[in-house]
Regions:
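Hydrophobic/aromatic beta-strand elements that line small-molecule binding cavities or substrate pockets
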Residues: 56, 80-81, 91
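Conserved short histidine dyad/triad with adjacent acidic residue
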Residues: 33-52, 87
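Short, conserved beta-strand element in jelly-roll/cupin
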Residues: 51-66
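A generic structural motif
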Residues: 67-69, 94
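Short acidic-glycine-tyrosine-enriched beta hairpin
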Residues: 71-87
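A short, N-terminal "cap"/entry segment at the start of jelly-roll beta-barrel domains
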Residues: 1-40
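Ligand-binding loop in jelly-roll beta-barrel domains
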Residues: 87-111
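Short, surface-exposed beta-strand-loop junctions and turns on beta-sheet-rich folds
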Residues: 56, 72-74, 100, 108
Length: 113
C-alpha cells in the first residue's frame, strides 16, 4: 500500500531555512479533533529517523526519500506530492534538497501531559 497519495501542484518559492529541521507556528483548529494542527515543517539536506503523528502533508519545495519502517516502502517526494503518515510509525528521512511541507496533523501525546 503506497503512502504517496498523489501530486497536487508545482510551485516556485524563494525561501531558505535557518536550522537543520524546523516547524513554524502550528495553528490549532477548533471544531475538529482535539489537538489537530496545521503548520509548516522543513529540513535541510541530511538524514534522520523519527516517530510520526497522524498526518497528511503536501510538499511545497525540495526533495526527500522517505523509508517507512512498518511497510519497508521507500518513496521519493517533491513539490506537490501528498503523503499520509500514521501515528506511532517510524521512518527515515533522507533530505536530498532542502524540503518544506505544509502539514495537517494530530500531535503525539507527550508523556507526563
Amino acid at each position: 500500500m503506497s503512502q504517496l497519495l498523489g501530486n497536487a501542484f508545482s510551485a516556485e518559492l524563494d525561501w531558505k531555512p535557518k536550522t537543520s529541521t524546523f516547524r513554524t507556528g502550528a495553528r490549532y483548529l477548533d471544531g475538529l479533533t482535539a489537538g489537530t494542527a496545521v503548520d509548516v515543517w522543513g529540513a535541510e539536506v541530511g538524514e534522520y529517523q523519527g516517530v510520526t503523528a497522524d498526518e497528511i502533508f503536501v510538499v511545497l519545495e525540495g526533495k526527500a526519500e522517505v523509508t517507512f519502517h512498518r511497510t519497508g516502502e521507500t518513496i521519493v517526494i517533491g513539490p506537490g506530492d501528498v503523503v499520509r503518515l500514521f501515528a506511532g510509525d517510524t521512518n527515515t528521512w533522507r533530505t536530498i534538497e532542502t524540503i518544506r511541507k505544509v502539514s495537517f496533523y494530530v500531535p503525539p501525546v507527550q508523556s507526563g501531559s
